[in-house]
């Protein structure tokens, strides 16, 4: 940088291009040196300071070249640059200070300066203001925030004093008002990110617990106490040495992530997007092992840093508030605790000492008083100081374990567990929970870290306990009152994923942990067995419902036999609903709700009638016809009409659908003659987006593929498809769909009309839409897997397809099946984040299972169509 010449100002721009051409490689070379030092592990605090210093020199040389010495103007770095920090792709924020006369006189000089800096490659963001204009602009606290961190680059003492006077607390934003504004800004910013840092692609600068939170604390400290950083508050008694050290350590951690992110993205990127996560993890030295991917280790460290920053920040914000508003008179709650300005505080300065029971007493009082705003900062710090000495449950005494179980049985148990988790107590009590805290899974299926997912599951259980009907969970409020001990479901929810990341089957490993915990807390053998079984089998109901044919009595028999009792079924159903809904906001839908409810009722009936003696096929057919007949009679249809419609429906239909579906199908068939096409659509559940589409048609080549392609083009995702052969060479197609894209309006009549129009034309002309793969999905590609087996009766071939999910996937598969002249009889569609796991039952065009050569040809065609490479 020192080689960039500092010439006398010249009103012409002659030579500026040469000057920029000399300066540009110097800046690039300086950045390359910093990158090398970054890779060698040099502290980020030094690297960002060195980059700011290099830019300082270039700025001063450019200023000297373009601005006359007697201009009356001064140059100041503001914002992050003002703090003396510049990350590789950060904006360079500057203020030119001068009165209006100087601004007008040197307007061309300033334009030349900024153009020159842009030519060099600096992303300059500038403001030109007089001191009075600075005072007016500082009415916006974001402007003031940038100005109070200013640093003179080319300025005399008078200019520095003028700027300081313009933004002095006596003129704009007194400290208390500034604190309130910054706190409101921080809370609003957190809300934009869902009030959590545990997102798949977190923002390490602006997200909760990010660098911006630390900068906000620094600005508050500067405005209120006149100190340059939070560490300086230690001497004033507002921050503990341990807190200051923790903030400094976590700031270095996040700053290293941000510095590396700017390098790998080669742009001012602040979000840890999937595009960069793996590359950044490798650059930072996080390696894969048998238990975790390197990227998962990196993200876990980030989430833990963000959580600790939030925890300490909450305490400091409260102390700043107390500094301005003063301490209120304590309101005694008894038991050694009081309310101070709405915050729960321990009365004793030595709390909790070495008494574990006092920590549990804190949470007991917190749960007992809904008016509590939170934990008092001094009590929170006292808790943090003794946290490392807080015992795990397996070495704690029996009284402490009894207190924990009492909290779990309390009316606000889930709130209490959330508080214990946020403050680090739950991870101390259950070390296995600490191990999964901040642990992410590098996929699109799990959108929360393991600990946050666990807490989401517990919140869903709390919703069931509220006793109010929730449209998302149609029967949960009916099942909940049957639970003998609700705390057992909470324990199962707490432990169901606790063994993630250890290698092996997390359900089996988690069951071992669960049993040890239950026995240590003196649960009965029966209760221990129930909770352990729930953890070990917590995926069973979800897998059965989504990957198997639950209209098949053999599937129901196997599932009911595994469950064994109505009590286990009730607990497992609620745990499954809470688990799926707590995995991703988009994962739970009306279709999954109905699917699990259907499995629950089918299993309950099997348990009631006895799993040893499942009803024979003829009995099931008779019951289904009788139930559907009763519904149609209630609608005014006579027996002759009902018999005629039933005769046109395949027997298999009565075994696959519920009575109300059968009645709807049969009533719809009244409108159509043999060899005609009928398309009907309706809402599968009232006041919900799920649609049921019924197509009755003469069997035609390409019918299934045309329907699937049309549904895809109209923005609907298919979750289940049933294709049955009906009398008179007709086909029964039933699809359960949900709007997938924003342009799918969810109108069943409009969708049915579109399908009628398509099916009235040439089906061979209907092709799948070509779609681009969304950016996120591109980072989770893998080779598709196609497996074949025979159906139980040997009449059909089963295909199990696992492939990277993408828009139009099923339409492409259906097109391949049509080209291969294959007939689809059943399809079950399941998507788990970036993975599509679909199953089909097919035959060749002569209704025979596929030969080995046909299987290989189909496998080759599907892989060629779906392979992401």
Curated annotation (Swiss-Prot):
<dbReference type="InterPro" id="IPR013546">
    <property type="entry name" value="PII_UdlTrfase/GS_AdlTrfase"/>
</dbReference>
<dbReference type="InterPro" id="IPR002912">
    <property type="entry name" value="ACT_dom"/>
</dbReference>
<feature type="domain" description="ACT 1">
    <location>
        <begin position="692"/>
        <end position="774"/>
    </location>
</feature>
<dbReference type="Pfam" id="PF01909">
    <property type="entry name" value="NTP_transf_2"/>
</dbReference>
<dbReference type="InterPro" id="IPR003607">
    <property type="entry name" value="HD/PDEase_dom"/>
</dbReference>
<keyword id="KW-0548">Nucleotidyltransferase</keyword>
<keyword id="KW-0378">Hydrolase</keyword>
<protein>
    <recommendedName>
        <fullName>Bifunctional uridylyltransferase/uridylyl-removing enzyme</fullName>
        <ecNumber>2.7.7.59</ecNumber>
        <ecNumber>3.1.4.-</ecNumber>
    </recommendedName>
</protein>
<dbReference type="Pfam" id="PF08335">
    <property type="entry name" value="GlnD_UR_UTase"/>
</dbReference>
<feature type="domain" description="ACT 2">
    <location>
        <begin position="798"/>
        <end position="869"/>
    </location>
</feature>
<dbReference type="GO" id="GO:0008081">
    <property type="term" value="F:phosphoric diester hydrolase activity"/>
</dbReference>
<keyword id="KW-0677">Repeat</keyword>
<keyword id="KW-0460">Magnesium</keyword>
<dbReference type="InterPro" id="IPR043519">
    <property type="entry name" value="NT_sf"/>
</dbReference>
<dbReference type="GO" id="GO:0008773">
    <property type="term" value="F:[protein-PII] uridylyltransferase activity"/>
</dbReference>
<dbReference type="GO" id="GO:0006808">
    <property type="term" value="P:regulation of nitrogen utilization"/>
</dbReference>
<dbReference type="InterPro" id="IPR045865">
    <property type="entry name" value="ACT-like_dom_sf"/>
</dbReference>
<comment type="function">
    <text>Modifies, by uridylylation and deuridylylation, the PII regulatory proteins (GlnB and homologs), in response to the nitrogen status of the cell that GlnD senses through the glutamine level. Under low glutamine levels, catalyzes the conversion of the PII proteins and UTP to PII-UMP and PPi, while under higher glutamine levels, GlnD hydrolyzes PII-UMP to PII and UMP (deuridylylation). Thus, controls uridylylation state and activity of the PII proteins, and plays an important role in the regulation of nitrogen assimilation and metabolism.</text>
</comment>
<feature type="region of interest" description="Uridylyltransferase">
    <location>
        <begin position="1"/>
        <end position="332"/>
    </location>
</feature>
<dbReference type="InterPro" id="IPR002934">
    <property type="entry name" value="Polymerase_NTP_transf_dom"/>
</dbReference>
<dbReference type="Pfam" id="PF01966">
    <property type="entry name" value="HD"/>
</dbReference>
<keyword id="KW-0808">Transferase</keyword>
<feature type="domain" description="HD">
    <location>
        <begin position="450"/>
        <end position="572"/>
    </location>
</feature>
<comment type="similarity">
    <text>Belongs to the GlnD family.</text>
</comment>
<dbReference type="InterPro" id="IPR010043">
    <property type="entry name" value="UTase/UR"/>
</dbReference>
<feature type="region of interest" description="Uridylyl-removing">
    <location>
        <begin position="333"/>
        <end position="691"/>
    </location>
</feature>
<keyword id="KW-0511">Multifunctional enzyme</keyword>
<dbReference type="InterPro" id="IPR006674">
    <property type="entry name" value="HD_domain"/>
</dbReference>
């Amino acid at each position: 940088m020192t080689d960039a010449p500092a010439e006398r100002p010249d009103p012409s721009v002659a030579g500026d291009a040469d000057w920029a051409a000399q300066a540009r490689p110097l800046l690039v070379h300086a950045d390359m040196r910093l990158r090398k030092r970054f890779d060698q592990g040099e502290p980020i605090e030094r690297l960002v300071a060195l980059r700011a210093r290099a830019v300082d020199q270039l700025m001063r040389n450019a200023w000297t070249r373009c601005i006359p010495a007697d201009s009356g103007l001064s140059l100041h770095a503001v914002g992050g640059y003002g703090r003396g920090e510049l990350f590789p792709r950060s904006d360079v924020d500057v203020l030119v200070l001068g009165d209006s006369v100087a601004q007008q006189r040197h307007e061309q000089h300033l334009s030349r300066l900024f153009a020159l800096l842009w030519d060099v490659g600096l992303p300059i963001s500038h403001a030109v203001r007089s001191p009075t204009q600075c005072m007016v602009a500082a009415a916006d606290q974001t402007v003031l925030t940038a100005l109070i961190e200013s640093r003179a680059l080319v300025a005399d003492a008078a200019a520095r004093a003028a700027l300081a006077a313009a933004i002095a607390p006596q003129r704009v934003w007194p400290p208390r008002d500034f604190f309130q504004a910054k706190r409101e800004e921080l809370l609003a910013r957190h809300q934009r990110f869902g009030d959590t840092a545990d997102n798949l692609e977190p923002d390490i600068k602006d997200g909760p617990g990010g660098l911006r939170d630390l900068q906000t604390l620094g600005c508050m400290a500067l405005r209120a106490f006149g100190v340059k950083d939070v560490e300086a508050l230690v001497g004033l008694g507002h921050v503990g040495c341990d807190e200051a050290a923790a903030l400094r350590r976590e700031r270095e951690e996040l700053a290293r992530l941000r510095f590396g992110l700017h390098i790998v993205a080669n742009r001012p990127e602040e979000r840890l997007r999937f595009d960069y996560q793996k590359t950044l993890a490798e650059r930072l030295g996080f390696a894969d092992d048998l238990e975790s991917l390197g990227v998962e280790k990196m993200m876990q460290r980030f989430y833990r840093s963000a959580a600790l920053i939030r925890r300490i920040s909450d305490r400091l914000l409260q102390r700043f508030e107390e500094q301005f508003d003063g301490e209120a008179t304590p309101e005694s709650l008894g038991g050694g605790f009081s309310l101070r300005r709405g915050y729960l505080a321990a009365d004793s300065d030595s709390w909790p000492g070495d008494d574990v029971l006092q920590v549990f007493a804190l949470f007991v009082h917190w749960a007992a008083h809904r008016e509590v705003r939170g934990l008092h900062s001094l009590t929170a710090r006292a808790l943090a100081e003794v946290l490392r000495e807080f015992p795990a449950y397996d070495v704690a005494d029996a009284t402490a374990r009894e207190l924990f179980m009492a909290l779990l049985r309390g009316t606000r148990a889930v709130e209490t567990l959330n508080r214990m988790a946020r403050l680090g107590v739950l991870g101390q009590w259950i070390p296995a929970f600490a191990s999964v805290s901040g642990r992410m899974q590098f996929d699109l299926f799990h959108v929360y870290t393991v600990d946050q997912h666990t807490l989401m599951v517990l919140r869903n259980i709390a919703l069931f306990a509220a006793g109010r009907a929730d449209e998302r969970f149609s029967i949960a409020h009916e099942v909940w009152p049957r639970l003998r001990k609700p705390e057992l479901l909470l324990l199962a929810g707490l432990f169901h994923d606790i063994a993630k990341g250890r290698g092996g089957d997390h359900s089996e490993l988690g069951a071992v942990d669960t049993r040890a915990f239950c026995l240590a807390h003196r649960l009965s053998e029966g209760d221990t067995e129930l909770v352990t079984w729930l953890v070990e089998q917590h995926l069973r109901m979800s897998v059965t419902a989504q990957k198997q044919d639950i209209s098949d009595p053999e599937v129901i028999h196997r599932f009911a036999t595994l469950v064994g009792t109505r009590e286990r079924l009730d607990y497992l159903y609620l745990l499954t609903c809470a688990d799926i809904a707590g995995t991703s906001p988009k994962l739970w839908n009306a279709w999954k709700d109905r699917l699990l409810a259907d499995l629950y009722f089918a299993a309950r009936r099997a348990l009631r009638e006895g799993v040893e003696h499942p009803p024979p096929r003829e009995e099931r057919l008779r019951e289904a016809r009788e139930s559907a007949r009763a519904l149609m009679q209630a609608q005014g249809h006579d027996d002759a009409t009902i018999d005629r419609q039933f005769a046109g429906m395949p027997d298999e239909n009565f075994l696959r659908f519920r009575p109300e579906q059968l009645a709807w199908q049969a009533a719809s068939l009244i409108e159509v003659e043999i060899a005609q096409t009928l398309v009907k659509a309706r809402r599968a559940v009232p006041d919900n987006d799920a649609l049921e589409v019924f197509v009755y048609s003469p069997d035609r080549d390409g019918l299934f593929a045309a329907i699937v392609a049309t549904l895809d083009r109209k923005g609907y995702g298919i979750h289940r498809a049933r294709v049955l052969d009906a009398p008179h060479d007709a086909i029964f197609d039933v699809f359960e769909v949900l709007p997938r894209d924003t342009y799918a309006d969810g109108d069943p009549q409009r969708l049915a009309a579109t399908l009628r129009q398509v099916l009235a034309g040439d089906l061979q002309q209907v092709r799948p839409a070509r779609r681009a793969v969304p950016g996120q999905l591109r980072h989770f590609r893998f080779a598709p897997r196609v497996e074949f087996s025979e159906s139980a009766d040997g009449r059909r071939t089963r295909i199990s397809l696992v492939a990277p999910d993408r828009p139009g996937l099923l339409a492409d598969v259906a097109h391949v099946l049509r080209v291969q002249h294959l007939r689809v009889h059943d399809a079950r569609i399941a998507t788990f984040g970036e993975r599509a796991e679909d199953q089909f039952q097919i035959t060749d065009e002569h209704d025979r299972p596929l030969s080995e050569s046909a299987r290989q040809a189909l496998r080759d065609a599907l892989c060629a169509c779906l392979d992401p490479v």
